[in-house]
């Protein structure tokens, strides 16, 4: 059975897709070229949207990326208003998403612990 999505979930997903396309194709600022939009959260009145992103260039470039995104936010909001039919086009607030890096860090810690455990068990067997 297909999953039911609320209107706000559909709007959030459409906003994420449209912003990703606009950033990729329309924003000429090189500071925002290598980002991926990971999530969008929208306020109940649609007045504000938190847009979460990750960067292929790493966390050290986040301040520059945020500066570029903030500079382009008026353009992005205007274009979003033309593409997404909602009563209020949200004000965009960009946030760096650390969850991907945190997930990688935790995965490495788990791998290290498993490796150490295997070595310890190998030594115990000998």
UniProtKB/Swiss-Prot annotation:
Instruction: Please name every pair of cysteines joined by a disulfide bond in this record.
Output: none
Q: Name one GO cellular component term.
A: cytosol
Among SUPFAM superfamilies, the record links this protein to: Ribosome-binding factor A, RbfA (SSF89919)
Q: What GO annotations for molecular function exist for this entry?
A: ribosomal small subunit binding
Keyword vocabulary terms for this entry: Cytoplasm, Ribosome biogenesis
Secretion signal, residue range per the UniProt entry: none
**Pfam families for the chain:** RBFA
**Domain of life according to the entry:** Bacteria
The protein's location, in the record's own words, is: Cytoplasm
GO terms in the biological process aspect are: maturation of SSU-rRNA
Query: What function is annotated for this protein?
Result: One of several proteins that assist in the late maturation steps of the functional core of the 30S ribosomal subunit. Associates with free 30S ribosomal subunits (but not with 30S subunits that are part of 70S ribosomes or polysomes). Required for efficient processing of 16S rRNA. May interact with the 5'-terminal helix region of 16S rRNA.
Assigned protein family: Belongs to the RbfA family.
Q: Which PANTHER family match?
A: RIBOSOME-BINDING FACTOR A, CHLOROPLASTIC-RELATED (PTHR33515:SF1)
Q: How does it assemble?
A: Monomer. Binds 30S ribosomal subunits, but not 50S ribosomal subunits or 70S ribosomes.
Q: What is this protein called?
A: Ribosome-binding factor A
The species is Azoarcus sp. (strain BH72)
